[in-house]
């Protein structure tokens, strides 16, 4: 039976995000052997944590005890090994960085659509489905027929969306992301831009994969996650992807068979952009990682939380 409970969580609500709260939460997590990342900002909390089930639920209870966070929701999955190397609690300006002011992800967002109703929505001929995630995430899995904005970061989404709206000004829009948080902001932004018919998948891809039977699913591929599992598939089972330790791109079976893939050094996505000196440095880091693994230790240079959690 899996030893670790993984909880992905977020909530938009006013928060007094200060150093004391940061220190208190980190201390509580470490006391209960809970690792992961929590982002604190004036607009709310976002993160993923993992550890013994009892410890994770203690931390969730502490978060829900904060004023305005009693309705914080989380999504659970499980892992046989700890998917994080350490606990990080960070103070940020935004819990998911879009860089747009004046949007209201608390009170003015799109219409939530339950996972069991999602297929009907995105099958409608007048609905355009948009993946709000970044290109490296979309590459390994997405919903059938969804548009990939090819963004490198979520900051690029507003400009892309404005250009898209010029070509489809009257479209009904369905948006989705990993756990729901980016869609809160993306649909709030769409509302600010004057879009009335905008919908988003409640609980994100993770809730859909947990809820909808694979035989009925419109999802194709795997879902990138922001921890050492790299990707999950239907039923939130561990996926087949791993990471390139040089560029942190997700690698599937075909990537691993490529002659450009050298474990710890390069992959098809970064081989052309690395100097001989960089490759030597990556090779030495990989050697240190293997030595640490042989001793039953973690080498802190290993990719842990792949990128800061976007949700």
From Swiss-Prot:
Pfam families: Rhodanese (PF00581), UPF0176_N (PF17773). One of its GO terms (molecular function) is oxidoreductase activity, acting on paired donors, with incorporation or reduction of molecular oxygen. GO terms for biological process: tRNA modification. The keyword Oxidoreductase applies. It catalyses: uridine(34) in tRNA + AH2 + O2 = 5-hydroxyuridine(34) in tRNA + A + H2O. InterPro entries: Rhodanese-like_dom, Rhodanese-like_dom_sf, TrhO, TRHO_N. SMART domains: RHOD. Residues 277-311 are annotated as: Disordered. Residues 123-217 form the Rhodanese domain. PROSITE patterns: RHODANESE_3 (PS50206). Residues 277-298 have a biased composition (Basic and acidic residues). It comes from the Bacteria. The keyword Oxidoreductase applies. Its EC number is 1.14.-.-. Keywords: Oxidoreductase, tRNA processing. The active site is at 177 (cysteine persulfide intermediate). SUPFAM superfamilies: Rhodanese/Cell cycle control phosphatase (SSF52821). Catalyzes oxygen-dependent 5-hydroxyuridine (ho5U) modification at position 34 in tRNAs. Belongs to the TrhO family. This is tRNA uridine(34) hydroxylase. It comes from Maricaulis maris (strain MCS10).
């Amino acid at each position: 039976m899996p030893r670790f409970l993984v909880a992905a969580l977020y909530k938009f609500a006013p928060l007094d995000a200060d150093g004391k709260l940061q220190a208190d939460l980190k201390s509580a997590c470490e006391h209960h052997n809970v690792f992961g990342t929590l982002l604190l900002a004036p607009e709310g909390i976002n993160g993923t944590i993992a550890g013994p089930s009892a410890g994770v639920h203690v931390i969730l209870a502490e978060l829900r005890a904060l004023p305005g966070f009693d309705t914080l929701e989380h999504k659970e999955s499980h892992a046989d090994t700890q998917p994080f190397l350490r606990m990080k609690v960070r103070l940020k300006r935004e819990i998911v960085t879009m860089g747009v002011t004046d949007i209201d992800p608390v009170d003015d967002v799109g219409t939530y659509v339950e996972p069991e109703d999602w297929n009907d929505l995105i099958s409608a001929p007048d609905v355009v489905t948009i993946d709000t995630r970044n290109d490296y995430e979309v590459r390994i899995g997405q919903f059938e027929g969804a548009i990939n904005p090819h963004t490198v970061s979520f900051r690029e989404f507003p400009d892309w969306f404005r250009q898209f709206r010029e070509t489809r000004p009257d479209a009904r829009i369905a948006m989705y992301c990993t756990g729901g948080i980016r869609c809160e902001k993306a649909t709030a932004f769409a509302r600010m831009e004057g879009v009335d018919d905008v919908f988003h998948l409640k609980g994100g891809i993770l809730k859909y994969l947990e809820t909808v039977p694979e035989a009925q699913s419109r999802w194709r591929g795997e879902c990138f996650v922001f921890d050492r599992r790299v990707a999950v598939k239907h039923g939130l089972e561990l996926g087949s992807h791993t990471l390139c330790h040089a560029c942190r791109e997700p690698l599937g079976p075909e990537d691993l068979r490529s002659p450009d893939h050298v474990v710890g050094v390069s992959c098809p996505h970064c081989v052309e952009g690395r100097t001989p000196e960089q490759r030597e440095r990556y090779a030495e880091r990989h050697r240190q990682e293997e030595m640490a693994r042989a001793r039953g230790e973690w080498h802190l240079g290993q990719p842990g939380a792949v990128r800061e959690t976007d949700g």
